[in-house]
């Protein structure tokens, strides 16, 4: 396994962790909150974002304008059944979601959730490191690499791992700050 492959895999993990963070509700409206909402559209589970135009007209409102007005009921039902904790307001033209301010208790829960997601990202990075180091040791055992080359590669892999773990910590700190800001 090449160092560039290790870096690519770790970068994908960082991006995945960032996407997970984006689905955590803060006090501000963010259309990413609806990324995981699936709508039963004529018997098919369809992502909400492919059925409607989603905008954030202000900091506390998400507006959902369905391309097909006949799907408003299903969209409303899907939002109610989702775990985002918001109640849709349907005015016949569009669906609005008002984002209430977060309570202190809810902020603490969200910080814990962000920490859990960050830890999952770190575990994924450590698994990538383990696989890469196993690959290097196997190459050394098969005499494809010298002992020194193997040790140097393992040190490089560890440096990259530390770098990407620090990036996840930075993302977590930024998300915690975002959640805690009133």
Swiss-Prot record:
One of its GO terms (cellular component) is cytoplasm. One of its GO terms (molecular function) is ribosomal large subunit binding. Keywords: Cytoplasm, Protein biosynthesis. GO terms for biological process: translational termination. It is found in: Cytoplasm. Pfam families: RRF. CDD domains: RRF. Gene3D superfamilies: 3.30.1360.40, Ribosome-recycling factor. Belongs to the RRF family. Responsible for the release of ribosomes from messenger RNA at the termination of protein biosynthesis. May increase the efficiency of translation by recycling ribosomes from one round of translation to another. This is Ribosome-recycling factor. The lineage of its organism: Bacteria, Bacillati, Cyanobacteriota, Cyanophyceae, Oscillatoriophycideae.
């Amino acid at each position: 396994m090449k160092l560039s492959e290790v870096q690519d895999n770790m970068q994908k993990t960082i991006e995945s962790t960032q996407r997970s963070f984006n689905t955590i509700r803060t006090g501000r409206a963010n259309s990413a909150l609806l990324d995981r909402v699936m709508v039963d559209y004529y018997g098919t589970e369809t992502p909400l974002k492919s059925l409607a135009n989603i905008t954030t007209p202000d900091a506390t409102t998400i507006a959902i304008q369905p391309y097909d007005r006949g799907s408003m009921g299903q969209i409303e039902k899907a939002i109610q059944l989702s775990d985002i904790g918001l109640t849709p307001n349907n005015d016949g033209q569009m669906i609005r979601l008002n984002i209430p301010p977060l309570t202190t208790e809810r902020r603490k829960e969200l910080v814990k959730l962000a920490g859990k997601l960050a830890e999952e990202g770190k575990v994924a990075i450590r698994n990538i490191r383990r696989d890469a180091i196993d690959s290097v040791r196997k190459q050394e055992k098969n005499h494809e690499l010298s002992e020194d080359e193997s040790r140097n590669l393992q040190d490089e892999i560890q440096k990259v791992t530390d770098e990407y773990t620090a990036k996840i910590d930075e993302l977590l700190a930024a998300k915690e700050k975002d959640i805690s800001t009133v």
